[in-house]
Amino acid sequence: MNTLNAPRNPTRHPAMTADTLVDAPALPHQNGSTEEKLKERGSFGKLYTYKRSPRALGIQAVAKSIGLELEQVELQPANGVPDFYWNLNPLGKTPTFVGADGLVLTECMAIALHVTNEDSTTTLLGSSSLDFVQIIRWISFTNTDVVTRMASWVRPLIGYTPYSKEEVLKAQQQTTQAIGVFEDSLRDRKYLVGDRLTLADIMCVSLVSFGFAQIFDKEWREAFPYFSGWYMMVMHLPIMKAVVEEVPFVEEGLPNAPPTEPFRAP
């Protein structure tokens, strides 16, 4: 195990499900004066994204939990983007944040950190500088290595990219390898960093949610009980339930076969 992530008071249980989440913590502590200041300020800005975007859910969850007024502007890059958007995000991707003060930010991790930092009393960024770098480590790892491998598994099965059985199998194996990093870390701990919920948990469950919605079926979850239990636990916390109407969860994953219908953007 990475000694930088050594367990503290581990309370993790691999068989945790929605029915057993009886001691889920409430929202992170929010100072009353901070809430009032945020309300008085009005709109914090706009977030260009699409509904249930894995890269936006965590941002929206944190913003709502601390009382930030963050407007969602619907934008699905797969359907094309308006001309003005290229000035905000030269790659035409989402999410993009445009603050009420004119600040423009791309990249979900940068946006999430900016939003979280608006609460001066937050516990979501850890209790030490070492906690903070571990939070960055987990979000970066998930947003790059994990999401990229998951996307290579899912996209050919939904018609977004050309289908190849061998390439899908390769992506499946690579995803399994990456998720193994989570599984090993969560064997003896409840959260990814320290002994309480952090931005790492919030952003990482959001980023992997499309896997649980399409490919991480019952058989797959049984092979990764700690990772799957952690996902269910965090997704059922009030901070996530406030923005996720129904936790993404599939009983039978997409088969490794050519898609039967043309791709439709969500």
Swiss-Prot record:
CDD domains: GST_C_EF1Bgamma_like, GST_N_EF1Bgamma. Keywords: Transferase. The keyword Cell membrane does not apply. Glutathione S-transferase; part of the gene cluster that mediates the biosynthesis of the diterpene ent-pimara-8(14),15-diene (PD). Within the cluster, the HMG-CoA reductase AN1593 functions in the mevalonate pathway, which produces isoprenoid precursors. The geranylgeranyl pyrophosphate (GGPP) synthase AN1592 is needed in the formation of GGPP, the precursor for diterpenes. Lastly, the pimaradiene synthase pbcA performs the 2 cyclization steps that convert GGPP to ent-pimara-8(14),15-diene. One of its GO terms (molecular function) is transferase activity. Belongs to the GST superfamily. Residues 43-123 form the GST N-terminal domain. It is an enzyme of class 2 (transferase). PANTHER family: ELONGATION FACTOR 1-GAMMA. This is Glutathione S-transferase AN1595. The keyword Transmembrane helix does not apply. It comes from the Eukaryota. GO terms for cellular component: cytoplasm; nucleus. Induction: Expression is positively regulated by the cluster-specific transcription factor pbcR. Substrate binds at K93. GO terms for biological process: terpenoid biosynthetic process. Transmembrane segments: none annotated. Glutathione binds at K93, E107, C108, N143.
